[in-house]
């Protein structure tokens, strides 16, 4: 595990710890963030902690043909109860991802500094949001970093049932249509697994990132 200086560089991802921690320090400038994502590295830390950079040995990803859409979710889609937009409310989406209550979590890893940094990426066209609306109210969404041919998903939120699933499915459809290789979901969880995501070795993930 390495300590970063102001120099714009990262250690080799193979030098990460067993749990995936690669480096501590540096900053959240757009240049450093883009360099990180180009090399399969992402920031993840809580308010008050130093900036921590991660590159897990196993990467959770979605190959689009493996996407699982349940029968009940297909009914939701067919009823047109949600409106889907892209890049209409990026800041609102990331702020909701920051503030939403999550089971088992007492804090948030989306700091105020991180919000400003990702909003700058969005202004550069490198960060994308998906918004889910119901009766003109934002009820769900997600955001991530566009590193074509890979999209790096960061976080999603839902204020009503199925809203975040709708965002995820809509994003997957958009990425498949536009010839992306895969959707990076970073770390395993049961919810992502239920949607068809699976883990692949880091080296395999990096090959997709470099294609």
UniProtKB/Swiss-Prot annotation:
InterPro entries: Acyl_CoA_acyltransferase, Leu/Phe-tRNA_Trfase, Leu/Phe-tRNA_Trfase_C, Leu/Phe-tRNA_Trfase_N. The keyword Coiled coil does not apply. Its main location: cytoplasm. It comes from the Bacteria. It is an enzyme of class 2 (transferase). One of its GO terms (cellular component) is cytoplasm. It comes from Flavobacterium psychrophilum (strain ATCC 49511 / DSM 21280 / CIP 103535 / JIP02/86). GO terms for molecular function: leucyl-tRNA--protein transferase activity. It catalyses: N-terminal L-lysyl-[protein] + L-leucyl-tRNA(Leu) = N-terminal L-leucyl-L-lysyl-[protein] + tRNA(Leu) + H(+); N-terminal L-arginyl-[protein] + L-leucyl-tRNA(Leu) = N-terminal L-leucyl-L-arginyl-[protein] + tRNA(Leu) + H(+); L-phenylalanyl-tRNA(Phe) + an N-terminal L-alpha-aminoacyl-[protein] = an N-terminal L-phenylalanyl-L-alpha-aminoacyl-[protein] + tRNA(Phe). Disulfide bonds: none annotated. It is found in: Cytoplasm. SUPFAM superfamilies: Acyl-CoA N-acyltransferases (Nat) (SSF55729). Its EC number is 2.3.2.6. This is Leucyl/phenylalanyl-tRNA--protein transferase. GO terms for biological process: protein catabolic process. Keywords: Acyltransferase, Cytoplasm, Transferase. Functions in the N-end rule pathway of protein degradation where it conjugates Leu, Phe and, less efficiently, Met from aminoacyl-tRNAs to the N-termini of proteins containing an N-terminal arginine or lysine. Belongs to the L/F-transferase family. The lineage of its organism: Bacteria, Pseudomonadati, Bacteroidota, Flavobacteriia, Flavobacteriales.
């Amino acid at each position: 595990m390495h300590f970063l200086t102001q120099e714009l560089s990262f250690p080799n991802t193979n030098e990460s710890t067993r749990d995936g921690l690669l480096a501590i320090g540096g900053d959240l400038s757009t240049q450093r963030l883009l360099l990180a994502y180009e090399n399969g590295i992402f920031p993840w830390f809580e308010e008050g902690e130093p900036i921590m950079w991660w590159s897990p040995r196993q990467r959770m990803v979605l190959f689009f043909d493996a996407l699982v859409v349940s029968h009940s979710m297909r009914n939701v889609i067919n009823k047109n109860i949600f409106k889907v937009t892209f890049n209409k409310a990026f800041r609102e989406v990331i702020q909701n991802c920051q503030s939403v209550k999550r089971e088992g979590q007492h804090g948030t890893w989306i700091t105020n500094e991180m919000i400003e940094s990702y909003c700058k990426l969005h202004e550069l066209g490198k960060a994308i949001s998906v918004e889910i609306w119901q009766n003109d109210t934002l009820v769900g969404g997600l955001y991530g970093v566009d590193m074509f041919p890979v999209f790096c998903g960061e976080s999603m939120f839902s204020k009503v049932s199925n809203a975040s699933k709708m965002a995820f499915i809509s994003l997957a459809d958009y990425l498949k249509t536009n010839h992306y290789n895969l959707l990076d979901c970073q770390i395993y969880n049961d919810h992502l697994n239920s949607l068809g995501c699976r883990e692949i070795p880091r080296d395999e993930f990096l090959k997709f990132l470099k294609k």
